[in-house]
Every structure is written in structure tokens, then in C-alpha cells.
């Protein structure tokens, strides 16, 4: 296998690189477990967290920080414009769930690499980089650690520090998404890498083709929702620290969210989709974020009705609706381009999709038509039952005077 990627050269660097990958993956898994524990601990006040993390949007702040447009009776105890409690909990625990899936992916990939390379000095670092590059592992560890800080700051209602932590999470998540999808290679080299990997180790190739696409789609869903969290935290910081009025901060947050969402979807279509073609997770994430934005605006409608124009609801619904149409159109475009790519490449993906669709169709038909009626088979009548039959023909005689057996009467029908 003397090719560009798999030269089979034994060296200490290969061995050190493989061990560093295992240590980094183990550290990430430990951080994910700690993040899981701290996230569940934030739900209870008996574990040291002062406030429930899901009620940030229901917290009251002084009116002197709320800007202008409020009546004197409304300036005391004003609630900030933020996600509702279910939406905040969804953002917190959906990220933890995706990181747990990534941990399972790394465990499975590491086991497959070890099974494929009994000699750890032979190509193990190249195979492990196919599962996840070191850049991906480092950024994953940063996001898992910073997420604990983010949840802790939300619980203490230190929204400025929470926003700073989330900016770091957002940047690290962006780097992870790009490095994890590309593996640090150009699209042409990535295709060559995968084709050679299928020959070198089919087990690792199976992991990074199917499982990696699932992991990337799940992360893109969460990352799409992170856009809304980022702009909402930015709006809160503008109101609390810089005296920006609530109408301006709310309008600016929605505009920035739409702009960032369009940039995100265009980056997916122009860059990331060249590596992983079946990629509808970003569009689903933006649709979920739009739903969260709409429900948050409705839950904050009492305050917005007083400080904004009376027609803000139709205008906001029209803007969010138009953006959702754009997102759906880009999702259809991504699906069509993915279908054309797999059809031109004659990959097994379309065959597997057709097989699954046919299986589902057959099961639905059976459920609709009811259980299958089996044919009933009856035992043949024994030969002795014809002995007393007066209409039974006597057996034929051979030329020697012996009776011939009629073999067809002894067979069961």
C-alpha cells in the first residue's frame, strides 16, 4: 500500500500520535460525563446552584437598566427578553445529548482502529484522524468544559459572563464542525482518502461514512439553535450594560439572527456539503430556532405590546415566516443536489433508501390489509376407509394373476 496516505512507515511519531489521540478522546469523554452531571444538577437548588437555569427569561431586573419606553408602573421588576423555560432546557440538554453521541462515535471509532491495526505503529494515527482529527477533539473538549461554565453563569444570573462563555462555545463549535467534516483535507483529497480507507480498513470506513454523517447532522441541528441563543444573549447584554432600549435590542437581535442564519446555511451549502452530501441538520436546526423565537416573542408579548408598535406581531410573523420559507427552499435544494450526487456516483445510499422505503411500504400494506390468511391443509383419507365401499374398483390383475398396486391411491393430496 505504497500510496499517498498509507505508506506503512513504522515510527515513534505514529505511536505517539495514536496515544495522544486516545488520551484526548478519553479526556473528552470524561468532560462530557461531568457536563452531563452538572447539567442535571442545575435543575435542583439543593446541589449548590442558586437559581433554576431554565427561568432566565422570567427573572426581573431594575427598570433603570431597561432603557426607554416603559411607564413608571412597569419599570420595576421588568423581565428580560429571553428564551422560555422549556426552550432554555432544550438548548442545554440537546447539546449534552449530541456530545454523548459523539462520545459513543469516538469509542466505536477507536475500537475499530485498534482492531484494524494490531500493530499500533502502523497507520494508526491516519486511521484515527479519519474518525476525528486532533483539532476536532480539542475543540470538543473546549465546548464541553465551557458549557459547564455557561450553565453555572446562567444559574447565578451572571448573564454577561454567560454570554462571554457562549461566544467561546460558538467559535469552538464552528471550528469543530469544519474540521470534523473535512478532516483537514480538501474535497478532492478527502474523496481519495475515503476510497483508500475502504481498501485498508472497511470497519473504520463504515464508521466514518454512516455514523459520521449522523453525528454531523445532529451537531448542525444544535449549532443552528445556538445562533438564536447567541443573538438573544447579545440583546440582553446591550440592554443591561449599554442602556439600549428593549425595542431596539429585540429588533436588532432578530435581524442579526436572520443574517447569521443565511450565512450559516450558505456556508453549509458551499463548503460543508462538499464533504458530507446528505446534510439536512442545519435546516432543521434553523426551523427549530425560528419556532423558539416565535414562542419567546409570544411569551414576552405583554411587555412588547407596551413598548413597541401595536402591529409588531404581524410584522414579526411575516419576517420569521419569510425566513422559514427560505430555509425550506434551501433544504429542498440540498436534498435535490444530494440525490443527484449519489445517483451520478452510483453509490449504495440510494439503494439502501429504496430498500428501507420498500420495507416500510410492505409493512404498511400488511397492517392495512390485516393479518395474512394461511391456507388450510386437510389430511388425506386413509386407504382402509375404502375397503367397504361398494363402488370401489377391484385392483387390476397382472398376466401372472397377481394384483397390481395402484400407487396413486396411496398418496396424500
UniProtKB/Swiss-Prot annotation:
Subcellular location as annotated: Virion membrane; Host Golgi apparatus, Host trans-Golgi network; Host endosome membrane; Host nucleus inner membrane
Keyword Transmembrane appears in the UniProt entry: yes
Keyword flag Membrane: yes
Pfam families recorded: Herpes_glycop
GO CC aspect terms: host cell endosome membrane; host cell Golgi apparatus; host cell nuclear inner membrane; membrane; viral envelope; virion membrane
Membrane topology: Multi-pass membrane protein
Cleaved signal peptide residues: none
Chief place of localization: virion
Key words, A-Z: Disulfide bond, Glycoprotein, Host endosome, Host Golgi apparatus, Host membrane, Host nucleus, Membrane, Transmembrane, Transmembrane helix, Viral envelope protein, Virion
Residue ranges crossing the lipid bilayer per the database entry: 20-40, 89-109, 134-154, 161-181, 219-239, 252-272, 278-298, 313-333
Residue numbers on the Intravirion membrane side: 1-19, 110-133, 182-218, 273-277, 334-413
Family, as annotated: Belongs to the herpesviridae glycoprotein M family.
Subunit comment: Interacts (via N-terminus) with gN (via N-terminus). The gM-gN heterodimer forms the gCII complex.
Cited function: Envelope glycoprotein important for virion assembly and egress. Plays a role in the correct incorporation of gH-gL into virion membrane. Directs the glycoprotein N (gN) to the host trans-Golgi network.
Name of the protein in question: Envelope glycoprotein M
Origin species: Psittacid herpesvirus 1 (isolate Amazon parrot/-/97-0001/1997) (PsHV-1)
Species lineage: Viruses, Duplodnaviria, Heunggongvirae, Peploviricota, Herviviricetes
Gene behind the chain: gM
Amino acid at each position: 500500500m505504497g500510496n499517498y496516505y498509507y505508506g506503512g512507515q513504522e515510527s515513534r511519531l505514529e505511536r505517539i500520535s495514536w496515544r495522544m489521540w486516545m488520551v484526548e478522546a478519553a479526556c473528552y469523554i470524561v468532560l462530557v460525563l461531568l457536563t452531563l452531571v452538572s447539567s442535571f444538577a442545575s435543575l435542583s437548588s439543593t446541589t449548590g446552584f442558586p437559581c433554576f437555569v431554565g427561568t432566565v427569561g422570567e427573572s426581573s431586573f431594575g427598570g433603570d437598566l431597561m432603557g426607554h419606553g416603559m411607564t413608571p408602573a412597569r419599570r420595576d421588576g421588568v423581565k428580560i427578553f429571553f428564551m422560555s423555560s422549556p426552550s432554555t432546557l432544550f438548548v442545554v440538554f440537546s447539546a449534552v445529548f449530541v456530545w454523548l453521541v459523539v462520545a459513543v462515535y469516538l469509542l466505536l471509532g477507536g475500537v475499530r482502529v485498534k482492531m484494524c491495526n494490531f500493530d499500533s505503529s502502523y497507520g494508526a494515527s491516519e486511521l484515527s484522524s479519519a474518525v476525528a482529527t486532533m483539532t476536532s477533539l480539542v475543540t470538543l473538549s473546549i465546548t464541553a468544559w465551557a458549557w459547564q461554565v455557561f450553565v453555572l453563569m446562567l444559574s447565578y444570573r451572571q448573564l454577561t459572563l454567560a454570554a462571554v462563555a457562549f461566544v467561546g462555545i460558538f467559535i469552538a463549535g464552528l471550528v469543530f464542525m469544519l474540521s470534523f467534516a473535512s478532516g483537514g483535507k480538501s474535497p478532492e483529497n478527502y474523496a481519495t482518502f475515503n476510497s483508500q480507507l475502504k481498501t485498508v480498513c472497511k470497519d473504520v470506513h463504515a464508521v466514518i461514512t454512516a455514523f459520521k454523517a449522523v453525528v454531523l447532522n445532529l451537531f448542525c441541528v444544535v449549532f443552528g439553535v445556538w445562533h438564536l441563543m447567541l443573538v438573544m444573549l447579545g440583546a440582553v447584554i446591550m440592554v443591561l450594560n449599554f442602556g439600549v432600549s428593549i425595542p431596539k435590542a429585540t429588533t436588532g437581535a432578530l435581524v442579526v439572527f436572520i443574517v447569521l442564519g443565511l450565512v450559516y446555511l450558505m456556508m453549509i451549502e458551499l463548503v460543508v456539503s462538499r464533504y458530507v452530501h446528505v446534510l439536512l441538520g442545519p435546516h432543521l436546526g434553523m426551523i427549530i430556532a425560528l419556532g423558539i423565537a416565535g414562542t419567546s416573542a409570544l411569551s414576552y408579548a405583554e411587555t412588547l405590546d407596551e413598548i413597541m408598535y401595536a402591529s409588531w406581531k404581524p410584522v414579526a410573523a411575516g419576517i420569521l415566516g419569510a425566513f422559514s420559507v427560505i430555509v425550506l427552499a434551501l433544504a429542498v435544494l440540498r436534498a435535490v443536489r444530494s440525490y443527484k450526487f449519489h445517483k451520478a456516483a452510483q453509490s449504495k445510499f440510494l439503494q439502501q433508501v429504496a430498500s428501507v422505503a420498500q420495507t416500510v411500504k410492505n409493512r404498511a400494506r400488511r397492517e392495512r390489509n390485516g393479518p395474512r390468511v394461511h391456507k388450510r391443509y386437510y389430511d388425506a383419507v386413509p386407504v382402509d376407509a375404502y375397503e367397504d365401499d361398494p363402488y370401489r374398483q377391484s385392483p387390476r390383475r397382472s398376466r401372472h394373476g397377481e394384483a397390481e398396486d395402484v400407487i396413486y391411491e396411496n398418496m396424500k393430496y
